[in-house]
From Swiss-Prot:
This is Cytochrome c. Induction: By oxygen and heat shock. It comes from Emericella nidulans (strain FGSC A4 / ATCC 38163 / CBS 112.46 / NRRL 194 / M139) (Aspergillus nidulans). Binds 1 heme c group covalently per subunit. Belongs to the cytochrome c family. The modification N6,N6,N6-trimethyllysine is found at K82. Electron carrier protein. The oxidized form of the cytochrome c heme group can accept an electron from the heme group of the cytochrome c1 subunit of cytochrome reductase. Cytochrome c then transfers this electron to the cytochrome oxidase complex, the final protein carrier in the mitochondrial electron-transport chain. It comes from the Eukaryota. GO terms for molecular function: electron transfer activity; heme binding; metal ion binding. One of its GO terms (cellular component) is mitochondrial intermembrane space. Heme c binds at C24, C27, H28, M90. Keywords: Electron transport, Heme, Iron, Metal-binding, Methylation, Mitochondrion, Respiratory chain, Stress response, Transport.
Amino acid sequence: MAKGGDSYSPGDSTKGAKLFETRCKQCHTVENGGGHKVGPNLHGLFGRKTGQAEGYAYTDANKQADVTWDENSLFKYLENPKKFIPGTKMAFGGLKKTKERNDLITYLKESTA
């Protein structure tokens, strides 16, 4: 039986924006037409498959993962990226707190559309 907190539920986008600033922005951009940094630009993330941001050099693991990004796949990925996609080059250790993942995903839904 699934526990509450095992999947995405809408969070606070303002808190998610702060998390993005402190935990993600050094490697990612969200703006339409924004460049890639260490990690890919995240604009258009929702509905896109792993390893598909044009012009970004992904690992084979990311290209072959066959995951379509949505709220629940991101929820699982952001808990522990290297466990979700073994071989990813994303160095981020993850967000263990359910609320933080929900807040960040809510922000990403708004900022990457």
